[in-house]
């Protein structure tokens, strides 16, 4: 008997141990990411040829303590390598594990390599060549908790590489993962007609067809690790191959099970057809290009086993939630009597199916932890709900979710008409009106941006996730927006430079109109979009006060107030911001509005330092500083509450007689030091009510605005 380790992804251990037991292996012991077993050589060949779940088969030749480099070297040196491979074969070391004296796998591999070549040399043989890639003979080493296990890669390249796949789709499913899904779903034990409505390149269907046809998964492979092992018995191997070919021929002819697959991507369907042809099961699989939501049951009862798209894989989260909701609706309505199994990494997407799982299992798709849920659909599972009637975990219609839907509809009816009258196409639709749904919803033309506020620590994460799922499910139906045009962001309390950090690089750009001005929006790349909607009336006021005046815009962001000033007839407009990115954006906004000329200046710099250095004066100054900033470009931190008097006293020096300062900020509990400003000879007028747009009336403390003049 020989000792082996069958490596497999985490979560496969139990199913793999059962598979090995069916083969007749002995001394089976589950471990982390694999199973140890014993078997004679002929059975090891059979397992390598027929295992549908294992990733690799390792022949274990040494296992012992290893506390230092010398013990590691001696463990490898004591093995009579000449009896395992020829010095004419190249070799390599696959070393796994770190800890203790093993700081990195390269160190461990190098020690073993030295021991192997030294052993060949000391036995009077020329040393074999070391190959970095594509070695003839591979030594496998595992170090864990002071123990070293040395073995021979018996199977060779990863066993999930069956040999039928030509190329892959964007998110291919490994073959042994598909096989594990078929095993754990119960399909392998009692096979029935099988449907995969998200078939991609066909892996689930092909693996199932190979099972049904008794086709050995490794039958088409061209390379195995044991081929350069000196104890390999070629005659025994060829006998097993001949047996497998005969079984495949008989099984393919006898198979009566049908397999159905579809995908919305015609390119992937064509690829699935080629893969099925390569695997020898093309005649058994019916493939078509179709939206999963249009698929109908091909037979009265069967299995639907699938790996739909999910967040880490493909697609927009809002679109995916809608897809899962509608898929669950369809399954309940049309697939009564079917067994359904779904693999997904996002529990919220699975919950959107609104199906009660018979069983939930954990599987890994590479390093990604996934849930594998099994469902039995009963013939009367046909209840259909409007997405506004989102189900709570208890299974009852959530009253608060319905209230959210009604509020969205009410706000949209009122505000969409108002926005049209105002001459704007971007506005705030909802701002945490209902405390349980702590989000802001903004309309930007035909797109929607949802900003999720950070929930209090007292609310469980599962609850906040479920509520966000409600929001994403309700919105498309409530206001008639395409789910693909909904963008989700998470907004936390802004601190320092965090305010304008980049989030993405997908460049979803639109042009919005505001009182005749045009502005470029970027809905995805940053937390903010390039236009603060709550300052709409403040910008309009800047435009109304700018005619014939020299205007200065500080902390200008994307220059939207500068555009209004220029369109309002300003004599000159100076735009200052620390960020080159936003200054370039401001210049784009000027170009959008046909504004060109030397009278429009764009200056990159620390605004606070620039104020101190400036020797010019202006008639109108608009300043909207951050609540707090400690940018690496600024010498000191800035706090608007602490520093506003100092800031305004410096700013007054830049103000001509008769000039005005429009000062605004977003600190909710900001208190203007009116006494200190009066002492500076300034009069102040609060403009909060005048500059608060209708769409922000529900949040009157969104910003502060003040008109400051010489007394």
Swiss-Prot record:
Its EC number is 2.1.1.173, 2.1.1.264. CDD domains: AdoMet_MTases, THUMP_AdoMetMT. It catalyses: guanosine(2445) in 23S rRNA + S-adenosyl-L-methionine = N(2)-methylguanosine(2445) in 23S rRNA + S-adenosyl-L-homocysteine + H(+); guanosine(2069) in 23S rRNA + S-adenosyl-L-methionine = N(2)-methylguanosine(2069) in 23S rRNA + S-adenosyl-L-homocysteine + H(+). The keyword Cytoplasm applies. It is an enzyme of class 2 (transferase). Its main location: cytoplasm. Residues 43-154 form the THUMP domain. Keywords: Cytoplasm, Methyltransferase, RNA-binding, rRNA processing, S-adenosyl-L-methionine, Transferase. One of its GO terms (cellular component) is cytoplasm. One of its GO terms (molecular function) is RNA binding. InterPro entries: 23SrRNA_methyltr_KL, DNA_methylase_N6_adenine_CS, RlmKL-like_Mtase, RlmKL-like_Mtase_CS, RlmL_1st, SAM-dep_methyl-trfase, SAM-dependent_MTases_sf, THUMP_dom. The keyword RNA-binding applies. Pfam families: Methyltrans_SAM (PF10672), RlmL_1st (PF22020), THUMP (PF02926), UPF0020 (PF01170). It is found in: Cytoplasm. Specifically methylates the guanine in position 2445 (m2G2445) and the guanine in position 2069 (m7G2069) of 23S rRNA. Belongs to the methyltransferase superfamily. RlmKL family. This is Ribosomal RNA large subunit methyltransferase K/L. It comes from Shewanella loihica (strain ATCC BAA-1088 / PV-4). The gene is rlmL.
């Amino acid at each position: 008997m020989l000792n082996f380790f069958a490596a497999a992804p985490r979560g496969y251990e139990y199913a793999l141990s059962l598979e090995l037991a069916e083969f007749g292996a002995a001394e089976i012991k589950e471990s982390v990411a694999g199973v140890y077993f014993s078997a004679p050589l002929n059975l090891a060949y059979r397992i390598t040829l027929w295992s549908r779940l294992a990733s690799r088969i390792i022949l274990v030749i040494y296992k012992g303590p290893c506390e230092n480099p010398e013990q590691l070297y001696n463990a490898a040196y004591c093995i009579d390598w000449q009896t395992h491979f020829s010095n004419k074969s190249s070799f390599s070391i696959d070393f796994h594990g770190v800890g203790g004296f093993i700081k990195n796998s390269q160190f461990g591999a190098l020690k073993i390599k030295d021991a192997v070549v030294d052993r060949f040399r000391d036995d009077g043989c020329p040393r074999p060549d070391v190959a970095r890639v594509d070695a003839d003979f591979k030594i496998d080493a595992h170090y864990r908790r002071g123990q070293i296990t040395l073995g021979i890669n018996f199977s060779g390249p990863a066993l999930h590489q069956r040999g039928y796949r030509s190329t892959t789709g964007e998110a291919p499913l490994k073959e042994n993962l598909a096989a594990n899904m078929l095993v754990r779903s119960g399909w392998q034990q009692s096979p029935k007609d099988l449907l995969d409505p998200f078939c991609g390149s066909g892996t689930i269907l092909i693996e199932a067809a190979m099972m049904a046809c008794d086709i050995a998964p490794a039958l088409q492979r061209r390379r195995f690790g044991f081929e350069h092992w000196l104890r390999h018995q070629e005659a025994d191997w060829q006998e097993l191959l001949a047996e497998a070919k005969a079984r495949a021929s008989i099984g393919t002819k006898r198979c009566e099970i049908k397999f159905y697959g579809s995908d919305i991507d015609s390119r992937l369907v064509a690829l699935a057809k080629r893969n099925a042809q390569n695997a020898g099961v093309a005649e058994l699989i019916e493939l078509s290009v179709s939206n999963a939501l249009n698929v109908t049951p091909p037979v009265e009862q069967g299995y639907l086993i699938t790996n739909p798209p999910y967040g880490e894989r493909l697609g927009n989260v809002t679109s995916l939630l809608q897809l899962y909701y509608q898929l669950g609706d369809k399954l309940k309505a049309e697939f009564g009597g079917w067994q359904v199994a779904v693999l997904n990494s996002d529990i919220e997407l699975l919950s959107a199916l609104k199906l009660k799982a018979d069983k939930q299992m954990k599987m890994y798709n590479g390093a990604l932890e996934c849930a594998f849920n099994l469902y039995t659909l009963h013939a009367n599972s046909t209840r259909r709900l409007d997405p506004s009637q989102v189900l709570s975990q208890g299974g009852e219609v959530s009253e608060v979710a319905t209230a959210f839907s009604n509020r969205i509809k009410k706000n949209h009816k009122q505000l969409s008409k108002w926005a049209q009258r105002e001459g704007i196409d971007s506005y705030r639709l909802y701002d945490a009106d209902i405390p349980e749904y702590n989000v802001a919803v903004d309309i930007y033309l035909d797109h929607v941006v949802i900003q999720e506020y950070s929930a209090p620590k007292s609310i469980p994460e599962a609850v906040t996730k479920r509520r966000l799922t409600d929001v994403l499910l309700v919105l498309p139906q409530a206001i008639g927006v395409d789910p693909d045009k909904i963008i989700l962001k998470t907004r936390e309390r802004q601190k320092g430079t965090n305010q304008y950090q980049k989030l993405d690089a997908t460049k979803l750009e639109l042009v919005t109109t505001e009182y005749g001005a045009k502005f470029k929006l970027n809905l995805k790349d940053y937390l903010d979009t390039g236009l603060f909607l709550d300052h709409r009336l403040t910008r309009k006021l800047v435009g109304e006060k700018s005619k014939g005046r020299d205007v200065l815009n500080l902390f200008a962001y994307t220059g939207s107030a500068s555009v209004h000033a220029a369109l309002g007839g300003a004599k000159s407009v100076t735009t200052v911001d620390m960020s080159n990115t936003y200054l370039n954006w401001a210049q784009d906004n000027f170009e959008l509005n046909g504004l060109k000329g030397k009278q429009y200046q764009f200056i990159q710099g620390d605004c606070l330092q620039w104020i101190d250095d400036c020797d010019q004066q202006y008639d109108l100054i608009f300043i909207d500083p951050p609540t707090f900033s400690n940018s690496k470009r600024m010498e000191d931190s800035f706090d608007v509450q602490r520093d506003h008097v100092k800031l305004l006293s410096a700013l007054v020096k830049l103000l001509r007689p008769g000039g005005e300062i429009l000062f605004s900020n977003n600190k909710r509990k900001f208190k203007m030091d009116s006494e200190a400003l009066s002492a500076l000879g300034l009069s102040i007028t609060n403009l909060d009510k005048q500059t608060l747009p209708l769409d922000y009336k529900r949040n009157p403390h969104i910003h502060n605005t003040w008109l400051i003049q010489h007394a």
